[in-house]
Amino acid sequence: MNILITNDDGIASSGIKALEAVLQKEHDTFLIAPLRERSATSMALSIYDSMRVERINDNHYIVDGYPADCVNIGLHGDIFPRIDLVLSGINRGVNMGHDIHYSGTVGAARHGAVHSRLSLAVSSGNITKDYDYIREAEFVRYFIDEYSSLLKVGVVYNMNIPFDFVSSMENLRITRLGKRTYEDTYSKKNIIGGIADFYLGGSKLEHATEEGTDFTAFFSGKISLTPLSLDQTDISLVQELSDTLSKSLS
């Protein structure tokens, strides 16, 4: 299988190195990643500016752009053979609930899904400095080898692995997205007249406890796998709104 590996933590991150080290034993891997940290960039693309792309060798490229840029170049830049699977991660920190809308890790995988590739985003709850993520990568390899035939194109599979996890399929749960709330705080500096620099000082994160969600699985020590559709239409509201508007116009 031809696997494109990318992330939003940057080319030097331990997570992406672990995936490549483990997967290249049995697959053809092609690594293309951002030059630097690009967290919370979702599916951003560099549309109006050029990007500097550095070729290390035939299988390794560095992009001074966003994670989705990396996927786009990897798929359409005539640098790799046809890619079968877009794999994004291993992210240093989880991406659950509403996080997925901000995440560059998930955004990169979603870009692969938009272009009809199998797409998997992987995040870890282990943010220990200098951690190597090899155990997580080994689980990802096993999952891909044994279950990739069950995956569908046009879907993003979002995997979150707890800090202390049992590496077995019996420990994996198929989940839905939970609900995350954010309480953001900003600081202002360099105030001159009506101009100031705003800095996001941090976010207080909370989540709802509901059965069947990624949060519930994760915090009970299970690996969560959430299938994410590209179609974000709220089907339940389509007919309801249509009927309501029709009545208001009649």
Swiss-Prot record:
Enzyme Commission number(s) from the entry: 3.1.3.5
Task of the protein: Nucleotidase that shows phosphatase activity on nucleoside 5'-monophosphates.
Reaction catalyzed: a ribonucleoside 5'-phosphate + H2O = a ribonucleoside + phosphate
Family statement: Belongs to the SurE nucleotidase family.
The keyword Transferase belongs to this UniProt entry's keyword annotation: no
One cellular-component annotation, GO: cytoplasm
Cofactor note: Binds 1 divalent metal cation per subunit.
Naturally occurring in which organism (per UniProt): Leptospira borgpetersenii serovar Hardjo-bovis (strain L550)
Cofactor field: a divalent metal cation
Subcellular location, principal: cytoplasm
Identification of the protein by name: 5'-nucleotidase SurE
Localization per record: Cytoplasm
GO molecular function: 3'-nucleotidase activity; 5'-nucleotidase activity; exopolyphosphatase activity; metal ion binding; nucleotide binding
Pfam families: SurE
Keyword list, A-Z: Cytoplasm, Hydrolase, Metal-binding, Nucleotide-binding
Binding locations of a divalent metal cation: D8, D9, S39, N91
